[in-house]
A protein has these predicted regions:
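Accessory N-terminal region flanking or inserted into the helicase ATPase core
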Residues: 2-108, 117-122, 135, 145
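Conserved helicase motor core of SF1/SF2 NTP-dependent helicases
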Residues: 106, 113-201, 212-216
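Acidic-and-aromatic substrate-binding clefts and catalytic sites of carbohydrate-active enzymes
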Residues: 209
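Conserved strand-helix element at the start of the C-terminal RecA-like helicase core
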Residues: 218-222
């Protein structure tokens, strides 16, 4: 059914998120998704149906037929191993475990703000074997946090030379001003003083839009 398919997709995505962030299956509830309490057994500290045990070994009434996410994740991973199914996170884990290196002298990584802990592990393995490494990123443009991206990996990276580009080739001045006001409250970020692409631009505020209203507005504007 559509409902079970949605739940299955979320569980697979959670398994991948745990791999990308190098976390244990027991941390499944920390994933940035919302779970339907009618279909999923929630952790004991938030689920009154849990009987005994803790976050790692809860027990449930015999008539509780809701899905156990950690059990399903373990079953999914076992299935992959038995049937030779390999996902992207699995490939990265194999690269890391086997110390597989590309036959290149220069390493270039774009959108570094969107890499995960697992990807960073591979990067750490590779960079020591390179003649030159270039990384590019903007901690104000993280869009894959839901996949486990960690902008601190960019902010804390030790580099020989740090170049901050002065110009935005995307945003006109009015939009850039709004963006700057929105991000200036973030305690840990790289300060930037960008020049706008051009003067002007239009900013439109829409109060409490639904997702479909937001999509329609973007489509109408574009």
């Amino acid at each position: 059914t559509a409902r079970s398919t949605t739940l299955g997709n979320k569980i697979i995505a959670t398994s991948q998120w745990l791999q990308r962030t190098r976390r244990d299956v027991a941390d499944w509830y920390d994933v940035p998704f919302k779970w339907d309490e009618e279909t999923v057994r929630l952790p004991p500290d938030v689920d009154e149906n849990a009987q005994t045990g803790n976050k790692y070994t809860p027990t449930w009434p015999s008539d509780d037929d809701r899905t156990s996410v950690p059990e399903t994740i373990r079953a999914w991973r076992q299935y992959k191993g038995e049937h030779g199914v390999v996902g992207f996170a699995d490939m990265l884990e194999r690269v890391k475990q086997r110390s597989l290196l590309p036959n290149v002298e220069y390493l270039v990584i774009d959108e570094f703000q969107d890499i995960t802990t697992l990807q960073y592990d591979v990067y750490e393995e590779w960079r020591t074997h390179m003649d030159t490494v270039y990384i590019a990123g903007d901690d104000d443009q993280v869009v894959y946090a839901w996949q486990g991206a960690d902008p601190d990996l960019l902010l804390e990276e030790d580099v020989t030379e740090d170049v901050i580009l002065p110009n935005s080739y995307r945003l006109p001045s009015r939009i850039l001003n709004v963006v700057n006001r929105e991000v200036e409250h973030i305690a840990k970020r790289q300060e930037k003083d960008l020049n706008p692409r051009k003067e002007g631009g239009r900013v439109e505020g829409v109060q409490n839009p639904s997702m479909i209203d937001l999509v329609r507005n973007v489509r109408r504007t574009v």
